[in-house]
A protein has these predicted regions:
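Thiamine diphosphate
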Residues: 1-76, 82
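Conserved small/polar residues in nucleotide/adenosyl-binding loops
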Residues: 89-91
């Protein structure tokens, strides 16, 4: 039976998003488990949200396709917002 985390991974893969930069916490374990079940999805661990969002931005610029990010809600998202804002600037 497909759960929401598997459906999200399937949706990402169906849209050619096959890399996820992640700084997961305990509340995201269902999605982390789903990433592990999808061999086509590459998950890259980052130890700080700024690294995760910066790496996703750099990947998208070099590969010319988006990457997914997995951050904690609240403070994790706040730590990544600066890079998310900068990713909107085309260099």
């Amino acid at each position: 039976m497909t759960n929401g985390a598997d459906a999200l991974c399937d949706t990402l893969l169906a849209n050619d998003i096959d890399v996820c930069f992640a700084n997961p916490g305990t509340s995201e374990m269902h999605f982390v488990a789903a990433l592990d079940r999808k061999p086509a999805m590459r998950c890259i661990l980052g130890l700080f949200e700024g690294v995760v969002t910066g790496a996703a931005d750099g990947y998208a610029r070099m590969a010319e396709k988006p990457a997914a990010t997995l951050l904690h809600t609240g403070p994790g998202l706040a730590n990544g917002l600066a890079n998310m804002h900068l990713s909107l600037i085309h260099i």
